[in-house]
């Protein structure tokens, strides 16, 4: 897209824009982004450029507040997980996936109810993403997207643990859908590296074998 000198670039998909023309505007450096949504825009720009370049996507700009950086990444993970949830609806039905499970070792209770209880997996997925959206959009805990209190940042770990169960259920029970979406987005790879980088989850709870795959690939690549 070539713009005349001095002409402002509208960084917005207008109503009626065709899918192939989405985001058809020049990239900006982080320093040029002057809105309160700059961190979100920067993350999304890097994802669009190359979603497989996870190290680049997770590398914060110099001087970036770490709490805001983690918060904006978690918002982005929830946005993209909605895409996986839509695909799961084609075969993850309440009568076939009656509980939210991954391996046979655990049955996850849904925290969306007054008293946590079992939910069909697809309902658990919807409830979890809705609950995460409510928390991350809460003016009580996250009134600003420029600075975040440490007490609010501490809540991000519990959100990570809950939404990770969507990945694990998809991997162990809907592998074809998981693989297709992962090949398109590298979302579980990115999430796994993200929570490990910022110690938001215990390695023991990361049961989708992303880390093992990377070790195997690095070993085979060095042979």
Swiss-Prot record:
One annotated Gene Ontology cellular component of this protein: FAR/SIN/STRIPAK complex
- InterPro entries xref list: MOB_kinase_act_fam, MOB_kinase_act_sf
What's the short name of a Pfam family annotated to this entry? Answer: Mob1_phocein
For Zn(2+), which residues are the binding ones? 92, 97, 169, 174
Matching entries from PANTHER family are given as: MPS ONE BINDER KINASE ACTIVATOR-LIKE MOB (PTHR22599)
The protein's matches in SUPFAM superfamilies, at most eight in alphabetical order, are given as: Mob1/phocein
GO MF term list: metal ion binding; protein-macromolecule adaptor activity
Q: Give the primary localization class.
A: cytoplasm
* Keywords assigned: Cytoplasm, Golgi apparatus, Membrane, Metal-binding, Transport, Zinc
Q: Which family does it belong to?
A: Belongs to the MOB1/phocein family.
Q: Which residues bind Zn(2+) 2?
A: 110, 113, 119, 127
Q: How does it assemble?
A: Part of the core of STRIPAK complexes composed of PP2A catalytic and scaffolding subunits, the striatins (PP2A regulatory subunits), the striatin-associated proteins MOB4, STRIP1 and STRIP2, PDCD10 and members of the STE20 kinases, such as STK24 and STK26.
Coiled-coil residues: none
Q: What does this protein do?
A: Part of the striatin-interacting phosphatase and kinase (STRIPAK) complexes. STRIPAK complexes have critical roles in protein (de)phosphorylation and are regulators of multiple signaling pathways including Hippo, MAPK, nuclear receptor and cytoskeleton remodeling. Different types of STRIPAK complexes are involved in a variety of biological processes such as cell growth, differentiation, apoptosis, metabolism and immune regulation.
Organism encoding this protein? Gallus gallus
The organism that produces this protein has a lineage beginning with: Eukaryota, Metazoa, Chordata, Craniata, Vertebrata
The record's annotation in SMART domains points to:
Mob1_phocein
For biological process, the GO terms are: negative regulation of hippo signaling
Q: What does the entry list as the binding residues for Zn(2+) 1?
A: 92, 97, 169, 174
Q: Where in the cell is it found?
A: Cytoplasm; Membrane; Golgi apparatus, Golgi stack membrane
Q: Can you say what this protein is called?
A: MOB-like protein phocein
Q: How does it sit in the membrane?
A: Peripheral membrane protein
């Amino acid at each position: 897209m070539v713009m005349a000198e001095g002409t402002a670039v509208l960084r917005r998909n207008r109503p009626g824009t065709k899918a192939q023309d989405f985001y058809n505007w020049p990239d900006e450096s982080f320093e040029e982004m002057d809105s309160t949504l700059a961190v979100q825009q920067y993350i999304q720009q890097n994802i669009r450029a190359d979603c497989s370049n996870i190290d680049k996507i997770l590398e914060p700009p110099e001087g970036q507040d770490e709490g805001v950086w983690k918060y904006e990444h978690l918002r982005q993970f929830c946005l993209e997980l909605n895409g996986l949830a839509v695909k799961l609806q084609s075969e993850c039905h309440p009568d076939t996936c009656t509980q939210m499970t991954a391996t046979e070792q655990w049955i996850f209770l849904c925290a969306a109810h007054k008293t946590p209880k079992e939910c069909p997996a697809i309902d658990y997925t919807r409830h979890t993403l809705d609950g995460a959206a409510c928390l991350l959009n809460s003016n009580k805990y996250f009134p600003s997207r420029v600075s975040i209190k440490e007490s609010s940042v501490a809540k991000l770990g519990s959100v990570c643990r809950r939404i990770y169960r969507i990945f694990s259920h998809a991997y162990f029970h809907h592998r074809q859908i998981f693989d297709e979406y992962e090949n398109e987005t590298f979302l579980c790879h990115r999430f796994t590296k993200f929570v490990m980088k910022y110690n938001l989850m215990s390695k023991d709870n990361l049961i989708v074998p992303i880390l093992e795959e990377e070790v195997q690939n690095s070993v085979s690549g060095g042979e």
